[in-house]
Amino acid sequence: MVSFIFTRIILFAAAINGAVALPMNTTEPEDFSILSRSGTPSSTGYSNGYYYSWWTDGAAQATYANGGGGQYSLNWSGNNGNLVGGKGWNPGFNGRVIQYSGTYQPNGNSYLSVYGWTLNPLIEYYIVESYGSYNPSSAAARKGSVNCDGANYDILTTTRYNEPSINGTQTFQQFWSVRNPKKNPGGSISGSVSTGCHFTAWGNLGMNLGSTWNYQIVATEGYQSSGFSSITVA
């Protein structure tokens, strides 16, 4: 089947403005919860002290909303299109311990992951905690494994050729840690992700992240699927 490893042109274009790790703007816009006829329009920004990123290609009926603190919700239907949204930080860094909790109920192809980008070199990365019907490990080259936060993860890489990114159309690598077994989707979910544990393991396998950090969020993604996600990050 076609892999769910897709790129988000509009999201990447919006993220370019944050590609250089500058001090965070202390003036935050109000929470984003605008609806349109096809759902919530794509947007990025800050909400209650957290960076958020939301992108949809418009093919699905999708509603994304930021709540208080690190909370966001996403409801999508129609089994069409691509979408991804979540809350976290911009810039990311390699020692953050991320807590998440909430509800994750995918129906079809979807991920719940720590997700982000670096530059120099350009790397897109995932730490996948749970997923729906499609295991991302099936479309990637396995490099090894690591135990982080009491769970085993498969470490994998893929390469994207001439694809959109936060730095324009590029060829770049994707780095993956995929929890094995995954956390069960379909209801309440929570966990802790020590990013440094994964990043150190990747480095030991020659998978080196870039020196400049872009955003780092806990994201819900969907591809030709439906579902509901309400996640709080801290």
Curated annotation (Swiss-Prot):
Pathway given in the UniProt record: Glycan degradation; xylan degradation
Pfam families reported in the protein's UniProt record: Glyco_hydro_11
Key words, A-Z: Carbohydrate metabolism, Glycoprotein, Glycosidase, Hydrolase, Polysaccharide degradation, Secreted, Signal, Xylan degradation
Domain GH11: 38-234
Species per Swiss-Prot/TrEMBL record: Leucoagaricus gongylophorus
Compartment(s) where it occurs, according to its Swiss-Prot or TrEMBL record: Secreted
Name of this chain's protein: Endo-1,4-beta-xylanase 1
EC supergroup of this enzyme: hydrolase
An individual GO BP term: xylan catabolic process
Signal peptide: 1-21
Location of the active site: E124, E221
GO molecular function list: endo-1,4-beta-xylanase activity
Hydrolase recorded as keyword: yes
Summary of the function given for this chain in its UniProt record: Endo-1,4-beta-xylanase involved in the hydrolysis of xylan, a major structural heterogeneous polysaccharide found in plant biomass representing the second most abundant polysaccharide in the biosphere, after cellulose.
GO CC annotation, single: extracellular region
